[in-house]
Amino acid sequence: MKRLQRLWPLGLLLGFVAGLPLWFIQRNSTFLSGAYRYPELDKPLIHSSIESTFVSWVDPKAPQYITSFLDRARQRRSLALITLEPFPDPSRPQSDRTLVRDVIRGDYSQRIKAVLDPLCRPEQPVLLRFAHEMDNTGQYPWSVARGDDYVRLYRAVWAQARHPQCQRIHWVWSPAGNATSDLFWPGGDAVDLIGISVYSSPRWSHNGQLSSFAQVYERRRWLHRQFRKPLLVAEMGVSGTDQERRRWLLDAREAIRRYPELIGWVYFSAPQPSWIPLATGHEDWSLSPQLLGLVTSPHPSFAFHCQVLHVSLPVLHRKICRIRQA
């Protein structure tokens, strides 16, 4: 948090974790919210304060896409959340097995530089969610069995971005939230926020009932207690009938009031990717515009104010923002 604090005017009681321009600070909503939509749509979501996307660093068009995405987020007065996926170079033999080694020895340095260049522009802050859900072993090439291998990968990329021009990149370490997530912790100096995934499907319970947002979130909350970083639900999805999903979202809106460490959420409004099959069958997490409105419509949250106070006036934060240990 130290490098974030330098970006704050002393005593400023409005803003996100750091460095957001005044046009963002003055938004009505006090809880960050947004959605990833596939296919991406030109029309912005009403009240959305986060623009979310996924980028593979081996995509030759990645730098240009990042530039245009950041421009779009700025025009919409939203915070950019970019999930950077370190897929192996398909032209390299067995690169899926040697990804960590190849990154460590510098084979991907030019690719990393190419995607960091637009991210390091001084015009706006960006949340960089790098190599997400690494604790789902085997799901991605970076979902390695050994936590220390992942840590070496993460810190190698983070180190390449340690540069004065990149101070507005805020790093989001984003496990799925499994019991072994702590094995992949890259160190507090390399993490500004912890991202988690919250999904619920009636197929995942023995009685066909949806697990509530609170039930799933509570199983992830230990990450905040252990590492003392604010939480962001970086991916969220619910399946079922529209009526079931509406009820789930309404309950979620009420539940977030109980979590002062939670600063926002992002809904994954898209079908489950076909190349990441689920044991319970295909899921479509897409929401109608009406239901997405429940995700992004303003809902004040105590968490936002506590995070502001933590950064700008820590003495006052200690008096009124006692985050529960339970």
Regions found by a protein language model. Name each.
Residues 68-85, 184, 189, 199-240:
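Glycoside hydrolase catalytic-domain groove-lining segments
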Residues 69-169:
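Substrate-binding cleft of extracellular glycoside hydrolase catalytic domains
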Residues 34-41, 62-70, 110-115, 175-186, ...:
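Alpha-helical scaffolding within the catalytic cores
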Residues 49-56, 181-210, 268-270:
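Aromatic- and acid-rich polysaccharide-binding/catalytic face
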Residues 25-108, 238-241, 266-267:
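N-terminal substrate-binding region of glycoside hydrolase catalytic domains
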Residues 1-15:
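N-terminal Sec-pathway targeting helices
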Residues 234-324:
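Substrate-binding cleft of secreted/luminal carbohydrate-active enzymes
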Residues 154, 162-180, 230-239, 267:
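Aromatic-lined carbohydrate-recognition surfaces of secreted/lumenal glycan-active proteins
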